[in-house]
């Protein structure tokens, strides 16, 4: 579930901007906004409206109103925020081109207002979408460039985000040690800031890795840190608790795995029941996938194969629109369950079908990576040739200057 986790983590970053989403509240606040004077209170109200609606198309409407008002008031900071909210919406739609468009719009405003935190958060959305689309080489290159840019403007959030992006790529390509190293570096950097949402997102990434590696000791440590950070943040900001329901669900789901690995299925079931309490109409579908997947693991541990298969089928239905590695992983898990249940006649054709699909996707991914490497090589080669040409021009200019100086010296000597 590596690529699935990736999308969940970045959504976690956007949660700091989220509030309870009710149509009544939105309509009420919009009426208030229309009566406000053209000052910072009006800007704040449009920002809040866009935050509330960030998962719906109305986010674009309110972000657009915020942008118009910020332009009218010549406020670069709120223009940055308006562009950022556009990137949040389009990120949730997996629309990398639109994220890029609004990043380009955001940059000059971020530079003028020095709101680099938001800019680098949005840049991270773009890079993580590259990883989600399996453009790994591009994501690595962009993450390294992001780190360099963040260093130049001394932006801690940018440094953290770049390390997280690298961690995501390494997780997705099963380079576990490099992924852990990058994310640990990000976590240590996050301790130097007061941004709890950033720490929560990093801890979720570390939890996903330690779960995949079945390192129960580290899984327990990171879960405890996540629980503490989440509790402190929502206690300090009680209005945000509902906005963090998906993260609470995430925490309980991964406690389920901790207890399953520890051989305590009864306790694991208690955590699943707790997780279910955080499901609602606004639950992002990938969190539902995580929830059903954990339930399948629980039923599998109890050898209740029919119930486990039903849960796996639920995840396959949710993921079937995009035949990616998550979809394949779930199909293979279903084949494993059928085999364990003694239904080999059903398992074997499913193994064959899924492995063919896996080979096809891996070949496509490999081709993408090779094209990216070749493209980077050609770009680097062109840049090298340009540098060589510049060197030749500079050398030629220097030779001409030296010749002129020699002629001048000779002329002066002749005169004297």
Please identify what each model-predicted range represents.
Residues 31, 67-71, 104-111, 144-151, ...:
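Amphipathic alpha-helical segments of tetratricopeptide repeats
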Residues 37, 74, 114, 154, ...:
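Structural signature of alpha-solenoid helical repeat scaffolds
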Residues 48, 85, 118, 125, ...:
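"A position-specific structural signal for the A-helix of alpha-solenoid helical repeats
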Residues 24-39, 60, 97, 306, ...:
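Hydrophobic positions within repeat-based interaction scaffolds
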């Amino acid at each position: 579930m590596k690529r699935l986790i990736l999308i969940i983590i970045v959504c976690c970053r956007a949660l700091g901007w989220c509030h309870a989403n009710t149509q009544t509240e939105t309509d009420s606040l919009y009426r208030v906004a229309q009566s406000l004077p053209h000052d910072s209170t009006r800007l704040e109200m449009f920002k809040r409206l866009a935050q509330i609606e960030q998962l719906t198309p109305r986010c674009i409407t309110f972000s657009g109103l915020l942008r118009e008002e910020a332009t009218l008031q010549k406020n670069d900071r709120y223009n940055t925020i308006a562009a950022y909210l556009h990137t949040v919406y389009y990120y949730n739609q997996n629309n990398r081109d639109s994220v890029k468009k609004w990043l380009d719009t955001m940059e000059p405003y971020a530079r003028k207002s020095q709101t680099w935190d938001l800019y680098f958060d949005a840049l991270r959305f773009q890079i993580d979408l590259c990883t989600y689309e399996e453009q790994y080489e591009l994501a690595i290159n962009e993450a390294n460039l992001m780190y360099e840019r963040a260093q130049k403007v001394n932006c801690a959030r940018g440094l953290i985000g770049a390390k997280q992006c690298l961690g995501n790529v390494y997780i997705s390509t099963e380079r576990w040690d490099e992924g852990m190293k990058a994310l640990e570096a990000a976590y240590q950097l996050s301790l130097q800031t007061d941004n709890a949402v950033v720490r929560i997102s990093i801890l979720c990434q570390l939890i996903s890795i330690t779960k995949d590696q079945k390192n129960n000791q580290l899984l327990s440590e990171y879960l405890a840190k996540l629980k503490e950070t989440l509790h402190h943040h929502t206690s300090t900001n009680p209005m945000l608790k509902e906005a963090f329901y998906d993260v609470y669900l995430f925490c309980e789901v991964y406690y389920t795995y901790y207890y399953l690995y520890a051989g305590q299925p009864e306790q694991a079931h208690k955590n699943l029941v707790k997780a279910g309490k955080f499901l609602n109409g606004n639950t992002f579908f990938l969190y539902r996938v995580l929830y059903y997947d954990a339930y399948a693991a629980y039923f599998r541990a109890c050898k209740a194969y029919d119930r486990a298969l039903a849960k796996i089928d639920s995840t396959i239905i949710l993921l079937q629109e995009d035949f990616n590695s998550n979809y394949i992983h779930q199909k293979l898990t279903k084949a494993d369950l059928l085999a364990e249940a003694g239904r080999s006649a059903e398992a074997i054709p499913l193994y064959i079908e899924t492995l063919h699909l896996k080979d096809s996707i891996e070949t496509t991914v490999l081709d993408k990576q090779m094209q990216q490497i070749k493209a980077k090589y050609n770009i680097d080669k062109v840049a090298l040739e340009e540098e060589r040409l510049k060197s030749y021009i500079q050398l030629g200019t220097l030779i001409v200057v030296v010749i002129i100086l020699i002629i001048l010296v000779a002329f002066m000597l002749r005169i004297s």
